[in-house]
Regions:
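An acidic/histidine-cluster motif and surrounding catalytic segment
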Residues: 1-7, 11-135
Length: 135
């Protein structure tokens, strides 16, 4: 298997710089979010601040931040633009078999996936269009 860039219908590129895939993949994370958090996740300012101040960084990637009570699932901003490795895909399949079919942001959380990271540089943002999971 090969790593994949996943872009949902509402992802839009904002960076003119190419995504440094090799560097991001060398960070060791299974799934890496590339979305800016503003408008994509609750407590987006806290998310952004925690990502930017995190010192345990490898190749511009940090662990997905904790922004709320540990009982609340927390992961990558928006879940609409991310890089997933074969190990990350296997983990998601395993979690789906274990917990059932849920939207990806319910399973793709730091409480269930230790190797969930985000880039400090944001390459995409969400477009403000109608969701396909909350019709």
């Amino acid at each position: 298997g090969k790593p994949m860039l996943i872009l949902e219908h509402d992802a839009m590129f904002i960076s003119k710089k190419p995504i440094p895939f090799d560097d991001i993949l060398d960070s060791g994370f299974e799934i890496i979010g590339i979305n800016e958090p503003f408008g994509a996740t609750r407590l987006s300012q806290v998310f952004h601040e925690n990502v930017q101040k995190e010192h345990f960084c490898k190749n511009d990637v940090v662990r997905a931040p904790l922004i709320d009570d540990i009982k609340v699932p927390q992961g990558i901003a928006g879940n609409s633009a991310y890089i997933i490795t074969p190990k990350g895909a296997y983990t998601m399949i395993k979690l789906t078999k274990e917990h059932g079919a849920w939207p990806n942001d319910a399973l793709m959380c730091r409480q269930l996936i230790f190797g969930l990271g985000v880039t400090k540089t944001y390459y995409t943002k969400i477009q403000r269009i109608k969701s396909t999971t909350t019709l």
